[in-house]
Amino acid sequence: MLDIQTYRDLESFRKRYRAEAPGWPAAVQQAIRTLAISGIRDPLSDQPIPPDRLVVSGPNLRETIEADGLNSRQRAELIVLRRLIEAGELLPLDKLRMYVSEAVTPFARYLQARVPHLRSSEYLPEPDHWLRGKVANRDIRRIGLPPAALQCVLCNEVFEHVEELDKALVGIAEVLNLGGYLLATLPLAYGQYESVIKARWRGDDVEPELLCEPEWHGDPVHPQQGSLVYQIPGWELLDQLRRAGFRDAALHAVSSTSYGVLGEELPIVFVLMAKR
């Protein structure tokens, strides 16, 4: 089973939520039982992955159901990528000029093995970081690639940490060619239009202004300190993308027992898609 529903505004999702939310907890439990019996398939190749290779390491199903270096939300993003390729919106993986904003993660290694023209990087502001010189160092606010150099950009769990999100979105639009795509996963304030602002950036050499108790998420290249959350984007993110130069912006709600795509609070995973 694979279900993808596309939303371009909050109200269209609210209608579904009001109609279906009471039955979602039972649907999640049934899906878990199905995965335990049948296993899943790889999101790009459709190769079967048996149940004994699935790892569920906690209750947050969006971040687990791990297999072959991918978790639930990452498979959701790759399903959307595959659909764009199959629809002729993007070139096949062996010809696709792609950038992913991570380089040392299992997800990055999965792509590095399949996308010959992949560029990958980490954010390494410290001049003495041990990864300097081993992987590319890029700031998502200014990727540093020529205009229209890319056909696809993937960002996973990045936008909540970006100090100047509007600036980053403009920069991403500039490095994509006309018709190129941004795909991203992020924690979403799915019930509201406004983003939840948790901290404000005040400059490179100034501590950020904290508007609430600081929230830190895990960061594979800064495991001791993590990464500060500046905002949890709401549905206004779609309008921010349109202002940044994207012709279309939408959120895909993906769920699939066949591919192991589930959430817990919601039985879906949101994948952001924006077309240049």
Predicted segments with their positions:
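A short His-aromatic
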Residues: 157-161
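Hydrophobic beta-strand segment of the Class I
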Residues: 153-154
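S-adenosyl-L-methionine-dependent methyltransferase catalytic module, highlighting the catalytic core
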Residues: 2-20, 26-40, 127, 163-275
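Conserved N-terminal segment of class I S-adenosyl-L-methionine
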Residues: 1-148, 199, 256, 260-274
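Aromatic-residue hotspot detector
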Residues: 51-52, 150, 244-247
